[in-house]
């Protein structure tokens, strides 16, 4: 990014401060923050968004439940209610981003030329009217003139975040009311995006719910400097408010719906044991990464294109760090791993970096196992990895959601996470993985276990049974120790030529270069030196 952009960014924030000063009331004390619930259903045939509102509700166990909603933007969306006017905002769930932000009603476009000195090969970006139509008509944008929103008391008044698909947002750090299914979270801090760059090749992001651990992004101070900024995460804010007792959460996703539980996980969704895998250690890592030891391809069919009547399993050594990321749609693995998988079906790796095979080279019983060690093996059907089928005179061709990843960023996205139950506990440096109960649904009765309790007796390599030997009390506060949110999915699609369509949030970013949309640029010190050079 060029230095003039950051001068411009500070000016833009100063202008924003002047224009909205009268809209803010500095009320002493902490704000009450609550999240209301809304559920939407996914139409598999039409592949279109449907929104069906439901009332606030609590699970029979007493835990608050928040439904997420399906959209066509390639992600899982949570409905977060903010403001004294209690409006609902659809925000992308992202385990690779720390900050929760929402788009402002008066959002204006950033052009590529305002951000980058060299714009060769860079999309010019969407116009202001286009962004407002996509973000504020299809979703809900934040209107700070009709709510009790106010700036935070921090000296860092603004934030700047850039993502792997080049999406860039600039805005204010805010405090306002929020609503969590009958629970109040005092003084909820979030970002309000007032300027945004979106490529015309991808869907507009209406906002993000950041589920990663706290990490440093770019901030803008009240004395007009670019500074390092570590925003409070939504998980940490729930802990600080004594709503949950541990900064951990469990995630259940499938093609239609899903569920996010802060502070706990749902035993009813799990078949067998939870396998606890160590988070990969790194001095600068702040992502939910684990070591993937190997992949096993199990073939069990014959076809017109593959002559062998019976094929044995093929073990492929990987032994590399991979990041679990709900903000990423596909699976990104080392180049030689992807090529080995393609070879098992006499397929190829396309120029776009994904596996292409004949559809009759596999059966419904074929699967790929992801092996994390200590019997932590999880199967994904090859059929479930198909993102597009193309008719051909020599036989239908299937494109798989397996991509060659960038060497600095191997990712297990939604095409993996839909087939496991995942639990994230940064403090314990553990990620729990479990096979899904085939009868699990987000509407079934919850059987919630506290993550802290589950991990007390766990050591490296051990698993925790989904059926506890002792009953555990999880009503640690008057609110309980877990929050339950449910989700619905947003699949991406692939065009006939194999390139990702604009429905995917990774279309021109992660899909082409293997970089997650959630990979925030963390370079504040560099920006300061550029600004004052």
UniProtKB/Swiss-Prot annotation:
Example of a GO cellular component annotation carried by this entry: plasma membrane
Single Gene Ontology MF annotation: peptidase activity
Pfam families from the UniProt entry: Asp
Glycosylation sites: 79, 106, 138, 153, 166, 271, 278, 299, 319, 439
Protein origin, superkingdom: Eukaryota
PANTHER family from the UniProt entry: ASPARTIC PROTEINASE SXA1, BETA-SITE APP-CLEAVING ENZYME, ISOFORM A-RELATED
Family from the record: Belongs to the peptidase A1 family.
Record's protein name: Aspartic proteinase sxa1
Native species: Schizosaccharomyces pombe (strain 972 / ATCC 24843) (Fission yeast)
